[in-house]
A protein has these predicted regions:
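Non-heme di-metal
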Residues: 1-391
Length: 391
């Protein structure tokens, strides 16, 4: 896929043909250990994208009356798409194991995006965020070992390192320092808009998952850890969401989101190794092409403009679903001490006082992310971990 403008000739599956049964929605899940980890990465990513598709369409429906019917019809299909995707996670994934998988998505997909993003500032923002999710993975891996005696690498399958990143205890910034500069809609490449919509969707899902699953733990440290990292995920949604131009009309945002869904499904279909799941990605790609066609028609009717104005321009290669280990290591070595001051990135020594004060109060009665990982160091070769105090 070099661009999306040619795709406008592909009508996809008509909306009235996009049908499901309960049985296929709650179908056979993947294997936790036998399927490739990137099959699960794609599943989690696409569930986040579909739930965000519901979210954005609900938002549009609340501010305009003429689209409520069409949006409701598309949302129903996307609800069923999200169900069929999300129900692929098997019941033998514990909530903590699923959490580890969510963080693998955040690391590997964000790292892939950071390397193909043409806007230097936006790419910097993705690198900044991935180092925080990288540390979240380390803290949750320690919790998985502590509570369940399990090796997180059973989920990660060796694709993603388990070492500290930028310390979670230092992620808690004043809200003023989580806002970012937006792309300019008239100047930004389509892929820049797609990236911002995609990563915002993925982080929103992670935030919601932690908010829902965190209170269900009996262990007080686990409850605190989920509370702490869920707060950081809200910061990430703020950060990535602010990358999009607020001057875009709701129709422009709808078009971008549909384009992002097409791009993401095409990426999944191209690289999926499980034939059954690949067929699902291909089916849903056709569904999204149908949704994109509907959005284009409403765009033409409401804004009296050609959708190619929004959907034109080249796209880089598909999202690369592969280990980004070397890139992440390079970013970790170069940028672990980076902080934010307003919308700009600065050295740790220049972090503004309002973030330091904000963090000091939050951390004043104990820091779960530090406690859970005290003495923890992941080591290969079994469920028993080597012990080394992490400062």
């Amino acid at each position: 896929m070099n661009n999306l403008t040619g795709i406008l000739d592909n009508k996809g599956t008509p909306l009235d043909k996009q049908k499901f049964t309960w049985k296929e929605m709650a179908g056979k899940p993947i294997s936790k250990l036998d399927d490739d980890a990137f099959t699960r990465v794609r599943i989690i990513l696409m569930n986040g994208i579909e739930t965000d598709a519901l979210r954005i369409k609900h938002g549009i429906a609340r501010i305009t009356g003429q689209l409520r019917g069409p949006l409701a019809e598309i949302r129903r299909v996307e609800q069923h798409q999200a169900t069929m995707i999300n129900w692929l996670i098997s019941a033998d994934h514990s909530p903590l194991e699923t959490t580890v998988a969510y963080e693998q998505v955040a690391i590997e997909v964000t790292a892939a995006v950071a390397q193909t993003e043409p806007d230097p500032y936006q790419a910097q923002t993705y690198r900044f965020g991935l180092l925080e999710d990288f540390d979240h993975l380390y803290r949750y891996s320690a919790m998985l070992d502590r509570l369940e005696g399990k090796d997180a690498n059973n989920i990660l399958q060796g694709y993603t390192d388990i070492v500290p990143g930028r310390k979670t205890s230092e992620h808690h910034r004043h809200p003023d320092n989580d806002l970012r500069e937006s792309y300019a809609k008239e100047e930004a490449a389509l892929i820049t808009k797609i990236h911002a919509a995609m990563i915002t969707a993925a982080e929103f899902q992670t935030h919601d998952y932690y908010m829902n699953i965190g209170p269900l733990f009996a262990d007080p440290l686990a409850r605190q850890l989920y509370a702490e990292i869920a707060s950081v995920e809200e910061q990430h949604v703020t950060q990535y969401g602010s990358l999009a131009d607020p001057q875009e009309s709701f129709m422009e945002k709808w078009l971008v989101h549909e384009a992002m869904e097409v791009y993401a499904y095409a990426s999944c279909a191209e690289q999926e190794t499980n034939p059954r799941i690949k067929a699902m990605w291909e089916r849903f790609l056709d569904y999204e092409l149908g949704h994109l066609q509907i959005a284009c028609e409403h765009f033409k009717n409401i804004e009296r403009r050609d959708p190619a104005e929004i959907l034109g321009g080249p796209l880089p290669k598909m999202i690369e679903f592969k280990s980004q280990r070397e890139f992440v290591r390079q970013v970790l070595a170069a940028e672990v001490n980076m902080r934010s001051s307003g919308t700009q990135y600065v050295d740790k020594s220049e972090e503004p006082q309002n973030s330091l004060d904000y963090r000091a109060h939050l951390n004043s009665e104990g820091i779960a992310s530090n406690i859970v990982s005290a003495g923890y160091q992941w080591a290969p070769g079994g469920e028993l971990m080597g012990m080394r105090k992490i400062s």
